[in-house]
Curated annotation (Swiss-Prot):
Belongs to the grammistin family. Group 2 subfamily. Keywords: Antibiotic, Antimicrobial, Cytolysis, Hemolysis, Secreted. This is Grammistin Gs E. GO terms for biological process: defense response to bacterium; killing of cells of another organism. It comes from Grammistes sexlineatus. GO terms for cellular component: extracellular region. Its main location: secreted. Has lytic and hemolytic activities. Has antibacterial activity with a broad spectrum against various species of bacteria including both Gram-positive and Gram-negative groups. It is found in: Secreted. Expressed by the skin glands.
Amino acid sequence: FIGGIISFIKKLF
């Protein structure tokens, strides 16, 4: 879901 995508992006940065 959206929250998972945001967490994934935060992990990249």
